[in-house]
UniProtKB/Swiss-Prot annotation:
Residues 519-542, 562-587 are annotated as: Disordered. This is Dynein axonemal intermediate chain 2. Belongs to the dynein intermediate chain family. Its main location: cytoplasm.
Amino acid sequence: MEIVYVYTRKRSEFGRQCNFSDRPAELHVDILPDPSQALNFIERNPCDVAIQCSHDMSEHEVNTERYDMEAHGINHVEGGWPKDINPQEMEQTIRFRKKVEKDDHYVTTISQLGSVMEHCIKQNNAINIYEEYFEETEELEGIDETPSANTVNVFRDPNEIKRTATHLSWHPDGNRKLAVAYSCLEFQRAPKDMNFESYIWDIEIPNKPELTLRPASPLVCLEYNPKDSHVLIGGCYNGQIAYWDTRKGGNPVESTVIEYSHRDPVYKVIWLQSKTGTECFSASTDGQILWWDIRKLSEPTEKLILDISKKENIDNALGAVSMEFEPTLPTKFMVGTEQGMIVSCNRKAKTPPEKIVCTYGGHHGPIYSIQRNPFFPKNFLTVGDWTARIWSEDCRESSIMWTKYHTSYLTDACWSPTRPTVFLTTKIDGTLDVWDYMYKQNNPSLSLKVSDEPLYNICMQDNGRFVACGSKMGVTTLMELSKGLYTLQRNERNLASAMFERETKREKILEARHREMRLKERSKAEPGEEVKDEKPAEDMKEIIANAEKDFFENIEAELKRKEQQEIKQSEDEHQEKEVSEEKIVHE
């Protein structure tokens, strides 16, 4: 900003006017050099010199305009029909064809064109141009390629108060959209003015969500209907179930009644393969599995309490954190619990207690993910604590394969839909690991630092090419894997089957060996001890009391030992002092 100040004065106060004129140069002083002064010159050594050695930097600011992107589509239908004929109506098209075939002009035109096309038709009938002559010598694709992944897009929570991206779901038709559920799962730490909205994103437009879903409570899980891509089902933090129809906007079409809903957050909701395509079931940490029909959400159609004692006691039920359902096995489903136990269930059992078939125990913490192998449904993948494990339905005591224990907690995992030996895991340090058991089993084939924030979930596209990861701050990262990680290799399915069968057989042998050792120990033990082994008399309270008793006894013994050492040490010091005094007196 320029500042101007005007000075005003009378002309008479300026003084006399200056008169300037040209004249030649004049020399006023000429000082000649003194040679005697040169003898007094002393060179300074060392000499301190200050210099500034740095890059020249300047600040630049650019205000760029943001491009608004829109999606446009064209609905192309079968052409060549009159306006009054609907190509979708079979009867109208058949009637029109018969009418045209009776026309004399049509017959002459077809006869003329037939002579031209006859030669080509005979060639097609004689030669199969699609025959593969070198089927067996087909080169393997992607084997020599180094595993890699590139970030395609990043979708950020548009709200000021960031929330965790708790669940991801791909659009079933074309996989061009991604539904993301946002919530805060930390108990009683949700911000006061936190937004409840979740979003549907177009993977090519990261600036603005395509549709905003407005539930009554934050969504913990969200799933597309595989039969109707316009319908989504969501599980809320307050235990309610709601469904949306994208053609009707972002408000839920209907929600369950709170009295008949879950009492805890709904961590998983899955669509069932039914004729109507309207049935689903949900799991929550309140220990209940509820079946629903979205045509009538007033109350659940079925209920299962996850009480492994089969007494249907809700107080003893195991909290469900993850759940799995394979459409090829319509009567079976599996549940991962907070206690690190896997519960295998049969939906078509006659009574609720019979629905719990068996349990698998192998994790030290909650099982955040459970998924069957898409190629071998008998094998399933689980993630809990610091490791990922691969199980077989035939081995209940232990898993057949597992990863090493990581330094960071694992949060989610999923199988590759195109390769039977590839699965992906996410960790709380923001790392995405891609495991390829076909080539390496000790370490991941690719470990990628996606974010500085914890990654909480992962979801792969149906073709295995793209994978999306959700973080704690609501950032969803879309990545493209290298071709070798999603291209099925030659003979890979047979090799994977042999590997799973080999590991299953090994675990069965170990289980049989352990069983024999336990029987031998029981046979050597006394009858009273044998009964004790079969039916332990001590309950959990007695075990805790005995442990506390042993602990305090050890503490008291240690204190007594230290006290005796101090007494002995003081006695030795006293004796040494007396000896030294006697020596002094003697001297």
